[in-house]
Amino acid sequence: MSEESLLERKYFDGIYIPAGLLVFGTVIVKKEWTLYAALAALILGAIKYFRMLPKKVLKPAVFQEFELKEKTIISHNVAIYRFKLPTPDSVLGLPIGQHISIGAAIEQPDGSTKEIVRSYTPISGDHQPGYFDLLIKSYPTGNISKHMASLQVGQTIRVKGPKGAFVYTPNMVRHFGMVAGGTGITPMLQVIRAIVRGRAAGDRTEVDLIFANVTAQDILLKEDLDALVAQDKGIRVHYVLDRPPEGWTGGVGFVTQEMVEKLLPKPASDVKILLCGPPPMISGLKKATEALGFQKARPVSKLEDQVFAF
């Protein structure tokens, strides 16, 4: 649901002022009907309020089609795809930390078609009505990612959801330790943005994120991450590169147990580790976190787990 205030102008214009005029007019014309007018204003105001709420469009069991509105090329194999929702005030209705499923009929080498489904986490949120954004890296062997790369503005994709075991709520932990590799940054960014937006309402969650990539050019959404770090002292990002440029001052190589111990919070009941990236990286990090004293990660993570892999 959109994070908005009941003091916004649209509520004054659409609810408070009309309700006030109804009650005020009744007092002038027939004072003894004031109570009935107040009840009518309350009922009509409630109806109008619920009609003004953002319309959630996702259906967990049903694929729906959404039109590609805009495509922003980030690099030779990465793009941000913006899809249009049915109305300007529609939202996906996607809880923070969950993802959507994209389905497509993909042609196979033998000429047949096969239904392929893959999961993606939008980098936009329900506070941005009317559209949703997907950051997707295309791989030579990636069925859906190649299909997405071939999409033209005006064409559609099939989406259903929400999916996923993780749902973020403010102050669910004191401190998140995060490790992301490549496009695994998308659920982390979604959670971090929610934390920063929630500061005014009392969200005190701290975040340390290790973001691993091959080269500096592979660091996705670096400007967005750096802006969040500059804006919020409770957010820290530690970049790690396998092939760093000359003069690089960040981490080098694969994310190791020593890096996790040095850069992420220590094991505690109010600490949670979030992981998202290539399977070999996640497998190694599950072993590393267990060796450091965190609870052993399950093969399939659940919300209550101390180490959660998306």
From Swiss-Prot:
FAD binds at residues 149-164, 175-209. One of its GO terms (biological process) is tRNA wobble base 5-methoxycarbonylmethyl-2-thiouridinylation. Its main location: mitochondrion. Pathway: Protein modification; peptidyl-diphthamide biosynthesis. GO terms for cellular component: mitochondrial outer membrane. InterPro entries: CBR-like (IPR001834), Cbr1-like_FAD-bd_dom (IPR008333), FAD-bd_FR_type (IPR017927), Flavoprot_Pyr_Nucl_cyt_Rdtase (IPR001709), FNR_nucleotide-bd (IPR039261), OxRdtase_FAD/NAD-bd (IPR001433), Riboflavin_synthase-like_b-brl (IPR017938). It holds the Pfam family NAD_binding_1. Keywords: FAD, Flavoprotein, Membrane, Mitochondrion, Mitochondrion outer membrane, NAD, Oxidoreductase, Transferase, Transmembrane, Transmembrane helix. This is NADH-cytochrome b5 reductase 1. The lineage of its organism: Eukaryota, Fungi, Dikarya, Ascomycota, Pezizomycotina. The gene is cbr1.
